[in-house]
Amino acid sequence: MLQDIAETAGQDEETKLQVINTFFNRRVLYRDDWETWGVADYWASPLETLSKGQGDCEDYAIGKYFSLIAAGIPSVKMRMVYVRAQVGGVIQAHMVLAYYPQPNAEPLILDNLVTDIRPASRRPDLVPVFSFNAEGLWQGVSGSSAGDPSARLSRWRDVFAKAKAEGWW
């Protein structure tokens, strides 16, 4: 992974997105938290996910988020987005990573269900519920601020601390 990040040095942000998105989508096998960790819901750090070689949707999004920070993309350009995803005929909870090239731009969606990066408008299967990053928590993707994510999302606070201890920035 570190080699993949290092190879993006000097590359534009779109290239960094492609490299990191492809890396996680190819190297991590989808498994739910019961299969991987023996609990209903666990947010793994990037190194935990990579050491297991498997994870669920949050683990893909978390790995991509911290890898892109390590590659030089500011966290303010990214948000973890909790969505309702239509998979087949079923609506299910899901997590993706949104990248904003400019503050008010349409985000690009990095996902493990759809391997290519697409603008949010080309993902009608996703309905955003809330989004967050190191700087804030929002209703939907562009809604009003809902406060400090570390105070409201204990799993985010925990994985953020683990990623920092692992040296992701």
Language model features: what each stretch is:
Residues 1-169:
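A structural boundary/capping signal
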